[in-house]
Amino acid sequence: MNSSILAKLEQLSIRLEEVSIMLSDPEVVSNVKKFTKLSIEYAQLTPVNQQFQTYLSHLKNLEDAQLILFEDDMEIKTMAKEEILNTKKILSQLDLKLKKSILPKDPNDSRNIIIEIRAGTGGDEASIFSGDLFKIYSRYSEKQKWTIEIISSSIGEHGGFKEIIARISGINVYSKLKFESGAHRVQRVPTTESQGRIHTSACTVAIMPEVENIEEINININDVRIDTFRASGAGGQHVNKTDSAVRITHLPTGTVVECQDGRSQHKNKAQAMSVLASRILDAQQQEQQEQQSSTRKELIGSGDRSQRIRTYNYPQGRITDHRINLTLYKLTEIMEGNLSAIIKPLIIEQQTNQLTELNNT
């Protein structure tokens, strides 16, 4: 382990002591918000520090065993050699764990998300595929015990969605689904195809961290135009006689959000504002990502939603993630919501690249 990493771990140990002292301060205890924040930090730092202290202890044992090699007693030297081998194995394992523990954390990982799926090239087949993608995320969310709520949707003429926007809430949603942003391509024979020809269609997926408190995004009310209109069902059929649907336009950016799936104008307005805030936050963070490491841009995308990230090939039962050249012949399983087979390799790839960068510092 290089000196810069050791220095970072020593700083974490010092910080843990500081937090421990602050948590016993009566003023901090009486401040619920500050006490909660520090308690979470303490809980995060404690296991890292415990591993670090264990690492230092084994490092001292290794140094002691290496000194014994200079002894004349062959039996003691043999025991020392065995001790050195075992200790090096333990240190190697602890080294990797500690490095992973200090990798840069994405501040959005614990957030809920706003997911937007839009049909792209391919007409009706693209709309049907967008519906299939929504089913994948719905089933995966169910397996993760997350909650999914549709905010807005536009039904395709032959099924699926021209566009669907939803909120997914639960534990660490963004950390697992953030890799889904980009263009998803499907190759299959449409049900309407009489010649049995394979068609290629595409959809775009946008994953945005949800803004828990809209006030954290500075939206000037004078920069927002709010219009109301009657909500419509499939085929343009009015589903109510009041102007419950809401369209919000953010004038500086030209961002437009519509919401009509809620039962009231108040709920639709709140949901539309939530989506707007998430889009603005996402745009700000996409800008920041341009200045970050190539690893992050490569895996999560540089903001270009048209970047093709994945192909679903039905005739071959194959799914390919182009970012890490991963090909799996588990299409049916993944379409049933078993996304972990793709998400885990993406996380491992990101961590591997981060570890490489860390080792080079």
UniProtKB/Swiss-Prot annotation:
Post-translational modification summary for this protein: Methylated by PrmC. Methylation increases the termination efficiency of RF1.
Task of the protein: Peptide chain release factor 1 directs the termination of translation in response to the peptide chain termination codons UAG and UAA.
Intracellular or extracellular location(s): Cytoplasm
UniProt KW Nucleotide-binding keyword: no
Top-level taxonomic group: Bacteria
Protein species of origin: Vesicomyosocius okutanii subsp. Calyptogena okutanii (strain HA)
Record key words, sorted: Cytoplasm, Methylation, Protein biosynthesis
UniProt-annotated stretches for the region Disordered: 283-307
Listed GO CC annotations: cytoplasm
GO molecular function annotations of the record: translation release factor activity, codon specific
List of residues that carry N5-methylglutamine: 237
Pfam entry (one): PCRF
Protein name in the entry: Peptide chain release factor 1
Family: Belongs to the prokaryotic/mitochondrial release factor family.
Family annotation (PANTHER family): LD18447P
Main localisation: cytoplasm
Keyword Nucleus in record: no
InterPro entries tied to this protein: PCRF (IPR005139), Pep_chain_release_fac_I (IPR000352), Pep_chain_release_fac_I_sf (IPR045853), Prokaryotic/Mito_RF (IPR050057), RF-1 (IPR004373)
